[in-house]
């Protein structure tokens, strides 16, 4: 497999401070540059609209990088500097799920992506 033309996306399951609170993310993705990817984060064990949802990523060998957050009541997203344009936060409150979509993937998007309450 020619890894120079592929981008590996990893997502991780995260658990809240209380054992009944869970954020379960979709599985890892392998995408080519220029493609798009949509990561899901399904919440359970709490009222979804009572807490904002944050997105954070960690590139290989790097520290955590906060990407921004989405207001789960209004659906209004706030993006950190450097994450406007190709990055889209969205929600489906009927299934308590937040989404991160990345368009026009670049090699530098290779990272582990986390949702965080």
Curated annotation (Swiss-Prot):
UniProt KW keywords: Adaptive immunity, Cell membrane, Disulfide bond, Immunity, Immunoglobulin, Immunoglobulin domain, Membrane, Secreted, Signal
Any GO BP: immunoglobulin mediated immune response
A GO CC annotation given for this chain: plasma membrane
GO terms of molecular function: antigen binding
Annotated stretches, region: Framework-1: 20-44
Signal peptide feature range: 1-19
Paired cysteines (S-S): 41-115
Chain residue ranges for the region called Framework-2: 53-69
Region ranges (Framework-3): 78-115
Stretches the record annotates as Complementarity-determining-1: 45-52
Compartments reported by the entry: Secreted; Cell membrane
Membrane found in the keyword field: yes
InterPro entries: Ig-like_dom, Ig-like_dom_sf, Ig-like_fold, Ig_V-set, IgHV
Residues annotated as domain Ig-like: 20-117
Quaternary state and interactors: Immunoglobulins are composed of two identical heavy chains and two identical light chains; disulfide-linked.
Function: V region of the variable domain of immunoglobulin heavy chains that participates in the antigen recognition. Immunoglobulins, also known as antibodies, are membrane-bound or secreted glycoproteins produced by B lymphocytes. In the recognition phase of humoral immunity, the membrane-bound immunoglobulins serve as receptors which, upon binding of a specific antigen, trigger the clonal expansion and differentiation of B lymphocytes into immunoglobulins-secreting plasma cells.
UniProt name for this protein: Immunoglobulin heavy variable 7-4-1
Organism expressing this protein natively: Homo sapiens
